[in-house]
């Protein structure tokens, strides 16, 4: 019998003796249990890729339990019902109606599923600092068994070394005993939701007043801001450490409890009057979803300056629906394009992070679209024809619609070809229009703050974004203008449905490939004209050359840059 099992048995016996002498102190979920989950479990049991959808970052997630249905599935023919924690159901019964089953409840004379999983792991501990047994499969692509309580015995027999925590040295004896005592007592959860401090409450009210101000112009700006900040973990100037908030749509106004409008996408029809509310982020903070954005007096002043300083008007508020989702340039055309672009430039690191670290970029299929390392630059608004030339903007806007709204599996090819051709028509329009403009140079790049230069690093099946140009000059660079930055954000963050079917996901990722190509071609226009074909030949080799011929609009190799740009970057 392993020494560790003997020790834990002795401790369990000792705790029983102590219990006979007097009641042990009550175990608190918040004080005693969540810290164990945070230290030992959330690395695998958080976010959409929680094993078996068992999210142990909060009491709500632990109570919700597990499901055999994975969130990430690039082959399903029908979209599945969303199962976003805190959004799509509340309480154990509601989640069980969506296919979840308890891991905390005892089953007759049998202990809770979690207790049995922990016991299996504790009974067969792994040797520290030794190679894992070959029979333990790991990785994002591993097939999780997700046994229900009645299936546990069969699971334990087939996978005797795959108790919990999986493939690590596991819990300390004290942690194990604490969890088992808690489960044996019925797994009570005393977790209280985070609440804003008095100072935060004042700032919450100020921001909610701004986004819920009356008037058509105010309503349109609020909708645009919400759609651009819904993923952010917001924090206040002078706020409490560890307190973050997120924008949500509610049926109730400020001052009343939030009645969440939980549509699949942030730009779906709410079906009722909308109030934009700030909701405290609940549960353990994990890196994958922690894309931060500060709220301050300076930020509010900047929003007011950008969006409310002009005399532009809204004649009619746009509705909702597939066409409105597909083309935000038409949906929000009443808002000055310069204001929209400048807001995104001011916060470029945040926006690039939303689509580089968001749900669309989980797994090799998505990150295969991008290269291992590249730099991102941005075109200055005063040199962006979409901002400065209303006639060009009017021609370009209908061509900027994005696919993915129609998820009919049988129509994937025809939809893809239609949107590819529309995108290439836009690229031809852009190429010809810029040919009549002053030659581009490095001075046409935006350099307004420290968001102006970004480095992106791909780590096989995930990616990260950092300010500054880091490392040696990469093989490729991306140059965003407003139409490209906005399309990237909407295609990969706003409109992407992680619960969508194979058609939706394929259209999204195929268009992402066109986005990458467009950003690379934008950058090449800064290079000496005679060198562009050589760069393309280096960037697109083997099957890439066929793809260039089949899907991409050709690069302009005749339009010369200014003398300053012809000096190049030494790439």
Question: Can you annotate each of these PLM segments?
Answer:
Residues 1-10:
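Bacterial N-terminal signal peptides that target proteins for export
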Residues 106, 241-363, 367:
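Extended alpha-helical scaffolding regions
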Residues 22-34, 38-170, 196-218, 222, ...:
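Solvent-exposed helix-loop boundary motif
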Residues 162, 169, 173-178, 190:
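Soluble extramembrane regions of membrane proteins in the secretory/endomembrane system
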Residues 310-470:
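Extended, compositionally biased alpha-helical segments that mediate assembly or anchoring
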Residues 18-20:
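Boundary at the C-terminal end of the N-terminal hydrophobic targeting segment
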Residues 560-567:
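Conserved small/polar residues in nucleotide/adenosyl-binding loops
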């Amino acid at each position: 019998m392993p020494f560790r099992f003997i020790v834990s048995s002795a401790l369990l016996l000792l705790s029983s003796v102590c219990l006979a002498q007097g009641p042990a102190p009550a175990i608190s979920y918040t004080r005693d249990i969540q810290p164990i989950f945070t230290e030992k479990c959330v690395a695998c049991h958080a976010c959409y890729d929680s094993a078996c959808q068992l999210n142990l970052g909060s009491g709500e997630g632990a109570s919700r339990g597990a499901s055999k249905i994975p969130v990430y599935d690039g082959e399903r023919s029908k979209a599945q019902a969303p199962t976003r924690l805190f959004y799509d159901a509340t309480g154990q019964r509601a989640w069980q109606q969506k296919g979840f089953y308890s891991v905390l409840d005892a089953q007759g004379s049998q202990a809770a599923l979690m207790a049995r999983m922990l016991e299996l792991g504790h009974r067969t501990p792994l040797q520290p600092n030794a190679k894992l047994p070959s029979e333990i499969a790991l990785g994002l692509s591993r097939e999780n068994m997700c046994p229900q309580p009645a299936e546990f015995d069969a699971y334990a027999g087939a996978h005797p070394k795959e108790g919990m925590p999986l493939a690590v040295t596991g819990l300390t004896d004290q942690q194990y005993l604490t969890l088992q005592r808690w489960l044996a007592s019925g797994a009570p959860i005393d977790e209280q939701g985070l609440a804003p401090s008095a100072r935060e409450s004042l700032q919450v009210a100020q921001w909610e007043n701004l986004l819920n101000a009356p008037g058509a112009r105010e309503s349109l700006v609020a909708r645009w801001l919400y759609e651009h900040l819904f993923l952010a973990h917001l924090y206040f100037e002078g706020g409490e450490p560890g307190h973050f908030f997120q924008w949500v749509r509610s049926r109730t106004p400020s001052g009343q409890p939030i009645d969440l409008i939980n549509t699949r996408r942030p730009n779906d029809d709410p079906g009722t009057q909308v109030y934009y509310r700030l909701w405290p982020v609940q549960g353990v903070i994990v890196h994958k979803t922690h894309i931060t954005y500060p709220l301050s007096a300076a930020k509010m002043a900047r929003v007011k300056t950008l969006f409310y300083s002009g005399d532009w008007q809204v004649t009619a508020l746009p509705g909702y629906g597939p066409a409105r989702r597909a083309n935000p340039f038409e949906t929000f055309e009443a808002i000055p394009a310069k204001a929209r672009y400048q807001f995104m430039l001011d916060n470029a690191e945040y926006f690039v992070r939303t689509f580089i670290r968001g749900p669309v970029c989980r797994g090799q299929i998505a990150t295969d679209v991008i290269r291992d390392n590249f730099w991102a630059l941005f075109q200055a608004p005063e040199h962006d024809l979409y901002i400065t030339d209303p006639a060009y903007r009017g021609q370009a806007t209908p061509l900027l619609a994005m696919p993915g709204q129609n998820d009919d599996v049988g129509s994937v090819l025809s939809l893809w070809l239609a949107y590819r051709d529309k995108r290439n028509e836009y690229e031809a329009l852009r190429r010809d229009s810029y040919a009549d403009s002053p030659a581009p140079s490095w001075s046409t790049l935006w350099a307004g703050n420290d968001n102006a230069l970004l480095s992106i690093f791909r780590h096989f099946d995930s990616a990260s974004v950092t300010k500054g140009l880091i490392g040696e000059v990469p093989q490729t660079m991306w140059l965003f203008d407003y139409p490209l930055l906005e399309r990237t954000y909407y295609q990969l963050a706003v409109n992407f449905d992680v619960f969508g079917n194979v058609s939706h996901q394929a259209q999204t990722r195929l268009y992402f490939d066109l986005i990458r190509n467009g950003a690379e071609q934008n950058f090449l226009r800064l290079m000496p004209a005679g060198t562009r074909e050589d760069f393309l030949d280096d960037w697109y080799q083997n099957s890439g050359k066929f793809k260039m011929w089949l899907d991409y609009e050709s690069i302009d190799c005749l339009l010369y840059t200014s003398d300053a740009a012809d000096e190049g970057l030494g790439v």
